[in-house]
Amino acid sequence: MEQPTSSTNGEKTKSPCESNNKKNDEMQEVPNRVLAPEQSLKNTKTSEYPIIFVYYLRKGKKINSNQLENEQSQENSINPIQKEEDEGVDLSEGSSNEDEDLGPCEGPSKEDKDLDSSEGSSQEDEDLGLSEGSSQDSGED
């Protein structure tokens, strides 16, 4: 009258000692399988670090050479500008007729306005009148 249960699936029941041994065997096999991939991962991780380190050193050397080239080109492009600024400062200090040297498109600089204000305010009054007229024109549109 014994019917096979789902746990036995028609197999004969075995002694508890045999079943415990199989469980222990399975338990021992699982950690060995799990440890093997971890060890291989550790090996690959340590081998990746020196490669990255070497890559950055090479990259750093390239950047340094590029930086030197960039700095040289920047110095060449900055030097003419600095020379012009230095000359402009010398001219504004030495001459009061700089406004006459300017073309029709160029207006007096802020430094020139400051110099004019120290000499007299008549020039500023004229400038203010012109700016007021231009603002009124824009308001009529």
Swiss-Prot record:
Pfam families cross-referenced by the UniProt entry: SPAN-X
Top-rank taxon: Eukaryota
Listed InterPro entries: SPAN-X_fam (IPR010007)
Compositionally skewed regions (Acidic residues) per UniProt: 84-103
Biased composition (Basic and acidic residues): 11-26
Region (Disordered): 1-47, 66-141
Composition-biased stretches (Polar residues): 1-10, 66-80, 132-141
Family label: Belongs to the SPAN-X family.
Protein name (database record): Sperm protein associated with the nucleus on the X chromosome N3
Organism of derivation: Homo sapiens
